[in-house]
Structures are given as C-alpha cells and as structure tokens.
Amino acid sequence: MLQLLATGGNGGAQESYTGLLLRLDRSAYEVRALSLSSGSAVQRLRRLGLEVAVIDEADDDAAVRELTAYLVRNEIDLLHAHMYRAEVIGARAAVAAGTAVVMATVHSSRVRSAEDVAALAALTPVMDRLIVPSASILAKVRAEGRGAASFSVIPNGVDLARFDLPLTACALRREFGIPGGAPLLGVVARLEPEKGQRYLIEAMPAILRGAPETWLVIVGEGSQEAELKSLAGSLPQPVASRIVFTGRREDVAAVTGEIDVAVLPSVREAQGISILEAMARRKPVVASAVGGIPEVLTNGLDGLLVPPADPVALAEACIRLACSPDLRARMGEAGRATVEARFSLDAMVRHIEEIYDEELVRAGALPPSAAPRLVHVIDQPAGRAVLEIPPL
C-alpha cells in the first residue's frame, strides 16, 4: 500500500499520518510512504528511520504522471491519500494505474473554494472510502457534494505510551525565565489565523488581572508569527513579558508535561490533536466549541469549552483553571480517561486496518479468509516501539 501525503510541512494531518505509518502492521502490509512536497514532516519521518519518497512537482499533471508510474512500478494495491492535493493527485493517478483500492482521510476543516469543492466532488465516485476524524467534518464533507461516498468516522488517536513516559527535563521554565510555581498556559499549534492565538493574546491582560502570576507559552511556527509577536509586544507590561514564543519544538511531549493548562482557541478545527496530547498528559484543556472539539471535550468534566473568537470567555475559563490546582488535577485525570477510552493511536490504527482489509477483500486483492488474521490488536507490537515523535 501507499500512504500519500500532500505536503511535508507541519500540522495535525502530518501528525496523524506519522502515527499511522509508525503503527501499521508490517507483518500484514508492505507499506510505502510518499509526499508531494518536502519539508519538516518528511525530515522527521526519515529521522525515525522510515523511507519516504518525494515527488516535488508543482505541476499537477506532471505529478499525476510521476505518481502513476510509481504506483505501477511498485504494484500498489491500495492508495490512502492524506490532505486535499494528495486526494486529487492520488485519485487521478490511481485510476490511470488501475490501483485496486483508493481511499482518503479528510483531515481539514478548511473552507474550500468553489473550484476545489467541484474537483473533490468530481473525484468522489472513484473513492472507495473516505475517512473523517469527527462527525462535524462528516457533515461538512457531505454538504460539499460528496454525500454519495462511503464514509467512516475514525477519530485521531495519540500514542498513550509516549505520554506515559517519565517527564524529561526540557527545562522550558528555566529556558524562558518562568517561575516554577507560576500557572502556565500553553497553546501548541501552527501560527495560522484559524488557530486563534490572537484571541488568547488579547485575553492575557484580563487573565493577569484575575490570576496575576500566570504565564503563556505559544509553541509553533507559521505565517502569523510576526503579527502575533507584534500584537503581544504591544500589550502593557507586565503582560507583554509574560507571553513567550518558543518556535517549533522537538520535545512536544515534555513541553506538554510542563504546562498547567492547554489552550486551543481555534476558530475552526477538525478535531485538535494537540488537545488529545494534553489530555494524555493529564492536563486540563480550554478550547473553542468549534468543529470536532466538542466531540472530544465534555464541558466541565475534562475541560472548558468557550465560544470562538471570544477573549472575554477565554480569560474567564483560563482564570478559573489557573486559580484552582484541584480543579486542574480533576479535569486532567478525567481527560486521560477520555483519551484512553476513545482516542488511542492503537484504536485508530486498528480501525483503519480493518477498513483496509474490508476494501481489499471487496476489490479481490485479498482472499476473504485472510482478512481476519491480518487484523490484530497488540498493546506493544514488535517493531512498533514507543518513540518520541518530534512535533510538527
């Protein structure tokens, strides 16, 4: 099979793609990985010892030709595309190559142009299965004219063992001069408009009025970095000095372990892998009630949901948690239980493997009698060691 990624840059889709590649059962499948561009995600996969081919071709028709040749040359039976361009290029190439099974995961809640929506709708009849991470994304995709597709809702999952490892000393607080006992808010996300960091920055003056010792770390990189830093710098002291931009980090599990409250102030979100990671680390979450987030968080149990683009509501929720260590602990334990029950990486991969086998049998590429033995759940499979996956 081929796992096809649209872009080798950073984001939640690449995080899900990486987890899937690391956990797929190599005794059942010959797995290949290919990205339609190079970037930090490709570099990370290679550092983890995975072979990743790259077709770095900006022209779509040329990319289709190269991918078609790759599919034929490597006798690919199943193509699983991740992200928009991979779905478009992958579907066209798979049809040309006669690939038995064509699937895609719709990772993004992005609002598509009319042209993009039309292109995806036109390709939907050749897709054997579409996977979505949440019911909200399912509704969105159906509304875009793809309702005739065969869908499976499979939530993103996180590697629980990775977040069970003892805290390593990433020295985040010492690195940035953050006092050890100060409540620390943290947002781990691409610095893009849809992630809503600006609303959390705007909330910081009110947060410090209600919880004067609070600090905020903003982890990630992206197109809004300069604008967000300028916004933070325009705030009065001591507020401005309490907002720290860390850039891209290679120790996301350790960073998550050092924060006290995880915040995701997105204005749209497919699901929110970073909040799953925080919950796996037993951290309470404040997040916008958008997209798939309410399907993850139960307000008042394992986190606090707030309206999107609302600095006042963000401030109130953050103050409530910053001022109550006991509440943070209770919500953190509840969040861990939620992830264990519904959002583990092994469960995600198991469900996807079941779909692979079902579709391969349907296409005649796998004998029906072989499918049951190819799907098995192992707590710590051989060859799937717990790895510290660097952040995107």
Where are these regions (language model features)?
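A conserved mid-protein helix/loop that constitutes part of the nucleotide-sugar donor-binding site
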Residues: 11-19, 183, 187-206, 223-230, ...
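Short hydrophobic beta-strand element within catalytic cores of glycosyltransferases
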Residues: 34-35, 284-287, 297
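A conserved, positively charged/aromatic
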Residues: 101-133, 144-146
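Carbohydrate-associated surface elements
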Residues: 136, 157
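A short helix/loop element that forms part of the nucleotide-sugar donor recognition site in Leloir-type
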Residues: 164-178, 233
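Nucleotide-activated donor-binding/catalytic signature segment of Leloir-type glycosyltransferases, i.e.
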Residues: 229-247
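Aromatic "clamp/platform" in nucleotide-sugar-dependent glycosyltransferases that forms part
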Residues: 248, 267
